[in-house]
Every structure is written in C-alpha cells, then in structure tokens.
Amino acid sequence: MSVLGLDPLPRGVILAATPLGNVGDASARLMHALQHADVIAAEDTRRVRNLAQALGIEISGRVVSNFDHNEKDRAQQLIDAAASGTVLVVTDAGMPIISDPGLSLVSAAAERDIPVTCFPGPSAVPTALALSGLGVGHFLFDAFPPRKPGPRKAWLESLRNEKRAIVFFESPHRVAETLAEAADILGADRPAAVCRELTKTYEEIRRGNLGELAEWAVDGARGEITVVIEGGTAAAATAADLVPKAL
C-alpha cells in the first residue's frame, strides 16, 4: 500500500507523531514518511516495524534506535544523515520530545542549520485534557512525577497553589500512592481525572475528586496512565498559606 498525492519528503529532520494505541490514527504523512525516509530514528526499532506492518506499508530506509540513553551519542550521526537526506524521528507513541526522545537531535540540527519540520498527530496530553471534563483552558504539563515519596511530595507541595490544570504521566505501579499524596497535599476534594489506555480497546476515563480516585486506584490501575488535576483557586489555599510571614 502506498500513500499517493503527497509531496516528496523534505531534506532534514522530521518529527512525526505515532498512534497512542489505535493504528487508525496514523496520518497519511506519517505513513508516507515511514515508507520513504532515508533513516528512521525510533525509540524502539521493533515497535516501528510492527507499526509499519499493521499499516500495511514497507519501510525502505535504515532503521536505527534513538532512545533516552543513546540519543546524545546518536545525534551527530543522524545530523550527518539529515544533511543530505531525510531522517524521520518517531517514538513508541505520541509526539517526539514530549517526555520522549528527540530534543538532542533538534538542538544539534539547529546548531548545524539543518531543517526540522513536524508531522503532527496523536498526543496523550491534549487527548487527556479534552476527555477530563475539567476546566483546562490553561494547563501545566510536568511529565512524570519523581519516583521516590520524598521528592514526589515536595513536587506536589510546589503545585499547591497552581491555578492551571496539572497534567502528568504516571506508572500504574505508583499511581495509587501519587493520587493519595495529591489528595493529602492538594485537597481530597480537588476535581481530577485518570485517563487510562487512551485510544486503545480498554480505554477508561475515571473522573471524580482526588480522594475518590486515590481510593479507586488502590485496586490497581493497569496500562498507560495520564492524570489531569483541575487547577486550584484562591479559596483553596490553606490557612498556613494565608498567615503573613514575619519579617
């Protein structure tokens, strides 16, 4: 299967979004790039080959790994390839750089004046915000919270008076603990949503307040998880926040 009616791929670096889970969300431009890019820099080479197979297309270019632990070392090699051809950057799901590899390559491209463009598409952050049912006109995305309880609680404390909606990813193994800490620090009655397995067969959007969601998550929340917490208000500030500090 070939994708017709599209312009030839440009020289340089292409950042392309891949489906979160439903291959039907793959854009025509992504499919075209997978077929014709000279080099595909993939977070997981097996995943991108499986995606191409699911889409019924063949990859003609070279596929190399480009993940968190090797992307800085890989950047120069990819920039050299992009100087005379097309390098397609994809991650396991969603948009490169958004809590995923890609930044080192884009920074190196800017230094070498190599063109960079984007083939937009699926992303968990706006998808979760749209499905949350919360007031999310302004939001703060903070990737993954710290893994250890101490730094995680300090992170939540720093968000106590954040008026924008807060969106972050979390491991299913830690989400119950994180939600319980958020309920304790931000307020158990703070509206929130847990978005699980977005666009996949078992997609689930669980809405409620932080206290309710923390209790629900104790039984186990599987899959890839995005959490959205509604922003606070001036009325939500704690008494301690309102006590004038001594000069």
Residue ranges and their predicted role:
Residues 42-43, 100, 169:
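Short beta-strand scaffold positions
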Residues 2-5, 10, 86, 165, ...:
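A contiguous loop/helix-start segment that scaffolds small-molecule binding in enzyme catalytic cores
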Residues 64-72, 144-149:
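Conserved helicase motor
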Residues 67, 74-123:
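Glycine/small-residue-rich loop that forms an oxyanion/phosphate-binding "nest" at active or ligand-binding sites
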Residues 104-162:
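Class I SAM-dependent methyltransferase SAM-binding "motif I" and its flanking Rossmann-like core
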Residues 1-67:
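Glycine-rich, flexible N-terminal cofactor/catalytic loop recognition
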Residues 46-48, 95, 124, 174, ...:
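Alpha-helix capping/helix-boundary segments
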Residues 34-40, 113-117, 165-166:
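Short active-site oxyanion
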